[in-house]
């Protein structure tokens, strides 16, 4: 019938017709998704295909659509459409056929486009993008296609001696043998009018992860009313049972180690713990950066004091106290160089203590939960295997009862630490955070500043004690030593006792810093950076002493010997 569009284009194609090879499609920039196009970013896709979301939308968990530009038809539709074009010319009425809505399902778009001409078919099949979550299931479409890629459901429903029964079951459905409207349901599945399935809705699991509570609730509603169909023959009963088994969402019956959708509770708790861990780490790095800037200023102060003490007994026109007092800033005693040195050490220890805390401690009921899950799934596997002597109806009923009881126990006490989440996400329980390069640089800067401050302060004290005639109470020490006047603690006219207290406190602080950096000092990268920085600044570094405290400890020991 030339000049008219055939209502059933698939029926006009002969069996064995060769399909013309499809030209490779050019994926250019105009096929970027709306989100990448709005931000003027490159739309990166896996294997250059638009059948899946791009990398940016998948990472941001946003819906990836191509609404403002054209997109190519999936390969399955192109394959079917090119093999079933109408022979002959099209009518003038088909040339003026209005385009369907932008959200038309792919099957309706295919049936509408086959009634157009060759030129209009190519333009009509390039429809705007349907949301990614509303796409039909590829396995269902492959099973509906015959060996010649034809969507022929009528032959399946009437074949193998069951033609009368298939026609009777499909009384209220259309009989044209084509796939009809696909509508997304409220549960996130897709309902398809399928003639060869009982009823007119076939719910299958979507390609995206569904929340565990929603899957369990829907699954329990179906389990409570699952019939056994004992009145049917054996072959029909097995067919109906297998179809009803496919009707239920498959996600809840898999072990937790095989599907990510069963780790909803654990994923939520893990996300919150990871967010808190990341927040603590970022806060520690920020505090380390602020502390390093403060210690750098303190280092400049004690360096000026070191330069002044080097000329302490070479200038006859100025006394030592007068010279050092004018060299240093006129700040209060609690803000002097030694006071800031000890306060900076205490602040550094506090930050490193929070940085070295374990990410999270393992709860005591982890082993119990693992044993319970293993026991439940062992019963499930035993029920699935079943005994060959028992009937199919008995095995099916036993499977549903075990599954139903297992889901009830999981819903009553949801375990955020399931077996899958424990193996996949919570391997860091009880372990300290592994520092990255940013944390290593911040710790290295604070640590080296502290070492330089301690080395400079004790160099000034040692030089003063060597050049002083005696330690009589009348002799005043340089301005840096009375820095022990912290929080009201002050020793007047007792410089030797004051220096002894300073050496004891400083030794304790250095030991605490070395203990806090035990994990960091064992890192090879941190060791290499520390060695390079210390050698550039002139501090001693030996392979047996990786902390770089040799110079400071030698000066402290020398001062203690002079005070004895």
Swiss-Prot record:
GO terms for molecular function: DNA binding; DNA-binding transcription factor activity, RNA polymerase II-specific; zinc ion binding. Residues 68-93, 152-197, 252-278 are annotated as: Disordered. It comes from the Eukaryota. Residues 182-192, 258-278 have a biased composition (Polar residues). It is found in: Nucleus. One of its GO terms (cellular component) is nucleus. Gene3D superfamilies: Zn(2)-C6 fungal-type DNA-binding domain. Transcription factor that specifically regulates the expression of the gene cluster that mediates the biosynthesis of the mycotoxins phomacins, leucine-derived cytochalasans with potent actin polymerization-inhibitory activities and monocot-specific antigerminative activities. This is Phomacin cluster regulator phmR. It comes from Phaeosphaeria nodorum (strain SN15 / ATCC MYA-4574 / FGSC 10173). The gene is phmR.
């Amino acid at each position: 019938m030339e000049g008219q569009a055939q209502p059933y284009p698939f029926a006009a194609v002969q069996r064995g017709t060769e399909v013309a090879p499809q030209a490779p499609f050019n994926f250019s920039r105009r096929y970027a998704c709306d989100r990448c196009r709005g931000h003027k970013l490159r739309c990166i896709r896996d294997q250059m295909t638009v059948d899946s979301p791009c990398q940016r939308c998948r990472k941001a968990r946003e819906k990836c659509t191509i609404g403002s530009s054209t997109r190519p038809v999936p390969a399955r539709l192109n394959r079917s459409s090119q093999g079933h074009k109408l022979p002959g010319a099209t009518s003038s009425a088909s040339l003026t056929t209005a385009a369907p809505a932008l959200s038309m399902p792919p099957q309706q778009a295919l049936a509408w486009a086959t009634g157009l001409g060759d030129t209009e078919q190519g333009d009509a099949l390039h429809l705007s993008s349907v949301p990614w979550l509303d796409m039909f299931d590829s396995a269902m479409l492959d099973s509906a296609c015959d060996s010649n890629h034809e969507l022929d459901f009528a032959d399946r429903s009437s074949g193998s001696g069951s033609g009368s029964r298939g026609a009777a079951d499909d009384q209220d459905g259309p009989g044209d043998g084509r796939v009809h409207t696909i509508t997304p349901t409220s549960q996130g599945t897709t309902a398809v009018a399928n003639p060869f399935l009982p009823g007119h809705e076939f719910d299958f699991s979507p390609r995206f992860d569904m929340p565990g509570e929603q899957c369990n609730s829907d699954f329990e509603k179906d389990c409570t009313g699952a019939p056994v169909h004992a009145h049917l023959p054996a072959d029909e009963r097995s067919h109906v049972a297998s179809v009803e088994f496919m009707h239920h969402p498959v996600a809840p019956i898999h072990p937790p180690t095989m599907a990510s959708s069963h780790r909803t509770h654990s994923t939520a708790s893990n996300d919150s713990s990871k967010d808190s861990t990341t927040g603590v780490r970022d806060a520690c790095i920020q505090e380390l950066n602020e502390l390093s800037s403060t210690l750098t200023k303190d280092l400049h102060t004690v360096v000026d004091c070191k330069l002044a003490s080097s000329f302490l007994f070479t200038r006859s026109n100025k006394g030592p106290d007068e010279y050092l007092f004018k060299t240093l800033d006129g700040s209060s005693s609690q803000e002097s160089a030694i006071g800031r040195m000890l306060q900076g050490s205490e602040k550094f220890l506090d930050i490193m203590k929070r940085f070295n805390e374990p990410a999270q401690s393992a709860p005591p009921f982890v082993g119990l939960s693992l044993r319970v899950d293993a026991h439940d799934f062992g019963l499930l596997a035993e029920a699935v295997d079943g005994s060959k002597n028992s009937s199919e109806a008995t095995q099916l009923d036993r499977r549903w009862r075990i599954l139903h009881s297992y889901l009830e126990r999981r819903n009553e006490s949801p375990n955020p630490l399931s077996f899958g989440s424990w193996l996949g996400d919570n391997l860091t329980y009880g372990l300290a955070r592994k520092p990255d390069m940013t944390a290593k640089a911040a710790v290295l800067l604070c640590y080296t500043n502290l070492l330089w401050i301690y080395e400079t302060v004790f160099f000034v004290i040692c030089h003063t004690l060597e050049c002083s005639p005696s330690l009589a109470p009348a002799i005043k020490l340089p301005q840096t030593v009375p820095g022990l006047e912290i929080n009201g603690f002050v020793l007047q006219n007792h410089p030797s006792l004051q220096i002894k207290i300073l050496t004891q406190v400083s030794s304790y602080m250095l030991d605490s810093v070395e203990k806090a950096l035990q994990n960091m000092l064992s890192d090879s990268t941190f060791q290499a950076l520390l060695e390079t920085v210390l050698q550039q600044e002139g501090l001693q570094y030996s392979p047996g002493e990786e902390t770089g405290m040799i110079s400071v400890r030698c000066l402290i020991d020398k001062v203690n010997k002079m005070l004895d």
